[in-house]
A protein has these predicted regions:
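Secondary-structure transition/capping residues
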Residues: 72-76, 136, 154, 158
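Axial heme c-ligation environment in periplasmic c-type cytochrome domains
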Residues: 18-24, 92-94, 118-130, 148-173
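Solvent-exposed, acidic/flexible segments
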Residues: 50-58, 99, 118, 136, ...
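Gly/Gly-Pro-rich "capping" loops immediately C-terminal to redox-active cysteine motifs
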Residues: 81-144
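C-type cytochrome heme c attachment motif
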Residues: 63-73, 100-112, 124-127, 141-148, ...
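Post-cleavage N-terminal segment of exported redox proteins
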Residues: 2-88, 177-184
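Secretory-pathway extracellular proteins and peptide precursors enriched for disulfide-bonded cysteines
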Residues: 42, 96-98, 151
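Short secondary-structure boundary micro-motifs
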Residues: 39, 47, 135, 150-151
Length: 184
């Protein structure tokens, strides 16, 4: 009997439920979607002098690799990096809030020497120079391209697209690449 009463109640509710389709708006999201689409994969040429042994550049690359930034960031960025980044084309006035610069947080997916809490989604980058560069399996251009826009040889990659989206500058990508291939 309980089953019959329950089924009767369900049937009654479904017969008298309100039709809300006329009050729910359905905006055309095409423009929003187009704005969020990534530009096509872009092939980049590494600039001359990109890979460096300069300890300051390597320190900046390491900071970008190991940190995300934001309000909870604890470490102070090395000389030449800022916690804030002005957006191109935006005029700032005294007292305006300048947005935080987002760093790579590459460590969330990759392991590398000295990493704490490294991820395992992306390849392990430990001993990269010895394993890949010195052996001839990869070159510096490959490292630069993988950081700039990894979709060139892997269209379905989960890695962030950094130069094409302007998340990083060419200089920052060179510094990250210099850190990855540097002795640790």
């Amino acid at each position: 009997m309980n089953k019959i009463v329950f089924i009767s109640l369900l049937a009654g509710v479904s017969l008298f439920s309100a039709d809300y389709s006329s009050v729910i708006s359905s905006p055309n999201a095409s423009k929003l979607i187009q704005k969020d689409l990534l530009a096509p994969a872009t092939k980049y040429t590494m600039p001359a002098g990109c890979i460096t042994k300069d300890p300051n550049a390597i320190a900046r690359g390491a900071f970008i690799f190991h940190n995300l930034n934001g309000k909870k960031a604890k470490k102070k960025p090395p000389k030449g990096l800022s916690r804030k980044q002005m957006k191109p084309g935006v005029t700032y006035h005294q007292g305006d809030k300048i947005p935080a610069k987002q760093y790579g947080n590459c460590i969330a997916c990759h392991n590398i020497e000295g990493a704490h809490g490294a991820g395992n989604i992306g390849p392990d980058l430990s001993n990269y120079k010895k394993t890949y560069i010195d052996s001839g399996a990869r070159n510096y251009q490959f490292v630069f391209q993988k950081i700039a826009d990894p979709r060139i040889d892997n269209p379905k990659t989960n890695m962030t697209v950094n130069l094409t989206t302007k998340l990083f500058t060419t200089k920052e990508i060179c510094e990250i690449a210099s850190y990855i291939v540097s002795p640790k």
